């Protein structure tokens, strides 16, 4: 039987909620299970680890960084806009921005989903559409909350993969495919540090990667949903874990 303690250690940024009046940090099972099924060992990262001295001690122990989706949104002041964000999670923002920049500097693999993609965009100098529904040229990218969860995560629209990038290398036989869509915000301006990897039919950025980094991929859809049942989703997670294994090998050579 495989010893899971030999698997790449993946740090997963948590989300803050309130449970029975208590501040609580949580992770949804679907994100954790997708990492386990792909051969990784997920480790929860509470927001207090944003403290620089703690983060400096933590990063050498991690083989990959995983930024999951969340009901919360990135605070607008982080990308140069005014106004409040009612669905904010400042602790997550603080940890995510710090850990993205540190991971990029150390060339640690990153896989970012939904809010995670938006964090990757903001951390590298880009900005977001705060309300996609107010952009008349864009499709409806939100889910219908009245539907059962299985239907909310059903395929919603196609994405077109850009040639020559990380996503096309992972999916060489698949230049377009259908994805689910459960987000109210999205990438507005993408930094020159990022490569656009895929777009939806309305032109909205659906995937990005960091240029000159071995594996730093963000996707706007949710491949973690029943990831073991869908070949395309499995390939993304397995590609991430493979990159983490390569990072381990690089660390051992130093």
From Swiss-Prot:
PROSITE patterns in the cross-refs: GATASE_TYPE_1
Subunit (UniProt): Homodimer.
pH dependence: Optimum pH is between 8.5 and 9.
Catalyses which reaction(s): 4-(gamma-L-glutamylamino)butanoate + H2O = 4-aminobutanoate + L-glutamate
Name the record gives this protein: Gamma-glutamyl-gamma-aminobutyrate hydrolase PuuD
Annotated S-S bridges: none
Phenotype caused by lack of the gene: Cells lose the hydrolase activity.
Regions annotated as coiled coil: none
Database matches in Gene3D superfamilies: 3.40.50.880
Domain of life (superkingdom): Bacteria
GO BP, one annotated term: polyamine catabolic process
Taxonomic lineage: Bacteria, Pseudomonadati, Pseudomonadota, Gammaproteobacteria, Enterobacterales
Induction: Induced by putrescine and nutrient starvation. Repressed by PuuR and low aeration condition. Repressed at the exponential phase and highly induced in early stationary phase.
Domain Glutamine amidotransferase type-1 stretches: 16-250
